[in-house]
C-alpha cells in the first residue's frame, strides 16, 4: 500500500538527516497517514488521509 494521501495526493518527501558534525545522509520523510471512515452519499468508505487533511476536514465539519 502506497504512502499517499487519498485527497491531496501528497506522498513521501526526501531530504537529509544531519549528525552533530553536520554530515548529511539521505532520508525519507513519510506522510502521517490515518485510516478514517467517511460517509459518502453512496455509503461509507475507509480512506487513508494525512493528519493535515483530517485536521482541515474536522474544522470544516466534514467528519
Swiss-Prot record:
Gene Ontology terms describing biological process: translation
Pfam families given in the database record: Ribosomal_L28
UniProt GO molecular function: structural constituent of ribosome
Keyword Isomerase recorded: no
InterPro entries, per database record: Bacterial_rp_bL28, Ribosomal_bL28, Ribosomal_bL28/bL31-like_sf, Ribosomal_bL28_bact-type, Ribosomal_bL28_sf
Alphabetical UniProt keywords: Ribonucleoprotein, Ribosomal protein
A cellular component term, taken from the record's GO annotations: ribonucleoprotein complex
UniProt signal peptide: none
SUPFAM superfamilies with a match to the protein in the record: L28p-like (SSF143800)
Database matches in NCBIfam families: L28 (TIGR00009)
HAMAP family (alphabetical): Ribosomal_bL28
Protein family (similarity comment): Belongs to the bacterial ribosomal protein bL28 family.
PANTHER family the record matches: 50S RIBOSOMAL PROTEIN L28, LARGE RIBOSOMAL SUBUNIT PROTEIN BL28A
Name of the protein in question: Large ribosomal subunit protein bL28
Species of origin: Mycoplasmopsis synoviae (strain 53) (Mycoplasma synoviae)
Amino acid at each position: 500500500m502506497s504512502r499517499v494521501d487519498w485527497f491531496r495526493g501528497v506522498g513521501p518527501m526526501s531530504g537529509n538527516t544531519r549528525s552533530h558534525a553536520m554530515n548529511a545522509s539521505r532520508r525519507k520523510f513519510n506522510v502521517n497517514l490515518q485510516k478514517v471512515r467517511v460517509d459518502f452519499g453512496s455509503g461509507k468508505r475507509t480512506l487513508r488521509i494525512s493528519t493535515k487533511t483530517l485536521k482541515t476536514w474536522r474544522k470544516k465539519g466534514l467528519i
